[in-house]
Amino acid sequence: MAALSNVRWLTRAVLGARNSGAWRGLRTAASAQAASQSQAQDVRVEGAFPVTMLPGDGVGPELMHAVKEVFKAAAVPVEFKEHHLSEVQNMASEEKLEQVLSSMKENKVAIIGKIYTPMEYKGELASYDMQLRRKLDLFANVVHVKSLPGYKTRHNNLDLVIIREQTEGEYSSLEHESARGVIECLKIVTRTKSQRIAKFAFDYATKKGRSKVTAVHKANIMKLGDGLFLQCCEEVAELYPKIKFETMIIDNCCMQLVQNPYQFDVLVMPNLYGNIIDNLAAGLVGGAGVVPGESYSAEYAVFETGARHPFAQAVGRNIANPTAMLLSASNMLRHLNLEYHSSMIADAVKKVIKVGKVRTRDMGGYSTTTDFIKSVIGHLHPHGG
């Protein structure tokens, strides 16, 4: 029960403290076929763990198909409860949103693709993925940026964790036109949520054997908002004398990540900064296709890719890299205390990459998504006995 209890321990501790044109192609027959194929192959296992699946937009349905194929081959005792929610495929409504929320609340665990948000203003400022985070209070986004053996990038042997507060900050959806041609966007920072994410970061570092936490901010300019966030991090840091604590301004952090990312261990930051740093750091180890991510509340766990990109231009072309989603699915199994299957799948993915014979285009190869899935399945083997 160690893996499952780790996350639950963290959450208990926490309680203590856009171009729309490309998206019209999503309504093509290829996209519909991928979604249909994915839905038709639901895993049905007696006594299995129920998990909500939300394929999302872009290549999401294709990535979920990869997860299902690998889970089937590995005989993973998980039953997917699939729902489709999209703001670009006429598959969004308050009723569908409530159905998704109901499923996630019932199952407690979900695996999701990116729900693309059109840049046009259509009356609702809060996107569906933002509403899901808020309604489920998925306050902590965790992205583990780690180099993959056998896949050389500009920086190798990286191992750092980005923890992002994702229920307030700049993504408050509080915008209005105060005068013609003048838009005001409100950034919300609260002591309660700043302390909560800081405590989550230090608890995470403690449980995972990490030695340092760096708070990323812009308090030199936003003296009250980011100043409060920084103050909360400093106060929480005093409760963890064995964990080294540092602070860094966001612009300097971006430069330092490119020049010397090895100085970082665990980074904690507000919403917008985390969104930017997640993507920057993913680029250091190979891009959006190889970095897994997860989001937590006190009750729920959601698994996804670390860099949230729908990759619309790849829809139906069989070129998407399923590495990040498969690794995220492996993390989900560890959360469910299915260590045997989690290790089997993660090791198979890493072996495929280390051997280097099967790589998708984003990794410099010519293999298709299907090729990668078949290779992973071919590398599955019994674990722990």
Swiss-Prot record:
The modification N6-acetyllysine is found at K199. One of its GO terms (molecular function) is enzyme activator activity. The heterotetramer and the heterodimer composed of IDH3A and IDH3G subunits can be allosterically activated by citrate (CIT) or/and ADP, and the two activators can act independently or synergistically. The heterodimer composed of IDH3A and IDH3B subunits cannot be allosterically regulated and the allosteric regulation of the heterotetramer is through the IDH3G subunit and not the IDH3B subunit. InterPro entries: IsoCit/isopropylmalate_DH_CS (IPR019818), Isocitrate_DH_NAD (IPR004434), IsoPropMal-DH-like_dom (IPR024084). One of its GO terms (biological process) is isocitrate metabolic process. Pfam families: Iso_dh. Its main location: mitochondrion. PROSITE patterns: IDH_IMDH (PS00470). Residues 1-34 form a transit peptide. Keywords: Acetylation, Mitochondrion, Transit peptide, Tricarboxylic acid cycle. GO terms for cellular component: isocitrate dehydrogenase complex (NAD+); mitochondrion. It is found in: Mitochondrion. Belongs to the isocitrate and isopropylmalate dehydrogenases family. Plays a structural role to facilitate the assembly and ensure the full activity of the enzyme catalyzing the decarboxylation of isocitrate (ICT) into alpha-ketoglutarate. The heterodimer composed of the alpha (IDH3A) and beta (IDH3B) subunits and the heterodimer composed of the alpha (IDH3A) and gamma (IDH3G) subunits, have considerable basal activity but the full activity of the heterotetramer (containing two subunits of IDH3A, one of IDH3B and one of IDH3G) requires the assembly and cooperative function of both heterodimers. Heterooligomer of subunits alpha (IDH3A), beta (IDH3B), and gamma (IDH3G) in the apparent ratio of 2:1:1. The heterodimer containing one IDH3A and one IDH3B subunit and the heterodimer containing one IDH3A and one IDH3G subunit assemble into a heterotetramer (which contains two subunits of IDH3A, one of IDH3B and one of IDH3G) and further into the heterooctamer. This is Isocitrate dehydrogenase [NAD] subunit beta, mitochondrial.
